[in-house]
Amino acid sequence: MFGFVINKLKNRKWLNLCLLMGVALFIALFVCHPMFEKGAGNQILDRLFTDHATQQNEYPAQMSREGTYAVADYPDSQSVLDKLSGYEKKWTEYVDINKVSSQQLITLSGGRADTEFGGLNHYFTIGYLPGLSEYADVVKSQTDTATFECSISEKTMDHYGLVAGEKIYLHVPDGSGKKEISFVISQICREKDINDPYWAKTLSDMGDVIFVSQDVFDEMMQYYSEDNISYSDFLMLDYRQINTENASLYDGYMEQFKDADKLYND
């Protein structure tokens, strides 16, 4: 009789232990379920970003603005670049994600041009791209000091049959007719890595731009005092920092940017 009671107590102890373990596992399942759900959501977000990059051939997390400023209001290139950087700063005050890269391009309308080796009546835009030397490979040529140096893309070179060292004679308005300015092609350039996030807009996308230094660009602005400066600004963000906890918040901020600024895009 005594042994029977002892066995019942032992069995009850193991039964209680099993029940306790079951309850603990049950509680753990409910506690961990949101974690599993969150992890799955983050994986889905990451896959969506990756698929977008592959299918659309563009960096998946970017904020951008394109438009024009009057030369009369912005007398030099740095004032325009500072304005664009101000937009980037404002965006990231709300969308608190690390910057991966930023591409800023400013251009003047340029004009018709002839080229040294027989090209007639081509149209070129004058541009300044601050990141060109860092993100593009170049083929250099010898130049003289009597002309302004410029760089062109391989696409522009092929399109017009230009070569390094060739001169471009650009006709620009000076208020009393036409004035000719000579540029010499000092560099042919192409993207070092076209898949780098910096190349939100590739050299081919930029059209027939003759790229000049910042100093030369500022000098050209004197001939376009009644014109506008066109600009594009692309800010690339680290999409890996976007997750299920902040995606809705950041999306809301971006929608507010669109409502407040018709030139903004993402």
Q: What do the PLM-derived regions correspond to, one by one?
A:
Residues F2-D266:
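Membrane transport/envelope proteins' first extracytoplasmic loop
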